[in-house]
């Protein structure tokens, strides 16, 4: 009997395998599936806007080489972020700001806002304050929002000023040098966002004992996702939300 349900699904950068990642069109695609749970990435632009993009530069997604931190949000919005997209997409998709993404998302149920590793304590402080400002402006709630990062120094900095829940993003790079659960707890995190390969039965048991909910990334095989939910995962971050929905509909509990 399957354990995976629609409620477990979180769209990765929108729906990365089915629509251009981290774009307004991609997020609309996710909403049109009836999914209002999303993971996305933000960076600071030159003019301190929170822009939604995964990489520190624009080459992979737009075909144009610009450093996000050295480019204004207005100039980033002139680029078309469908360059890497593997599916047909009829319209251009500019790099959006976080405000543009969330100001039109009326029924948001859950969002993981991921901050990529930052270079210095000074930049961490700036990011933490700008993120807090934008979260307040957007009226983001602790019921819907988690600030996530693999940069645990940033998490500690942000946690000092931002009351929203925080989550540690952990993969082999962290797990090889430290216990992800201990790092999450020492960083004041409320969620462990774990690479699914690390979610063994022993890890699942340890997370339960630590009372630490787990969100797994990036799971694109439905059988694996179902197994992870059986082990206790609270949510599954996937590039293929529509494909997962179809499987769930064909395998009712």
Task: Explain the meaning of each model-derived region.
Residues 1-253:
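Phosphate-group recognition and catalysis centered on beta-loop-alpha active-site segments
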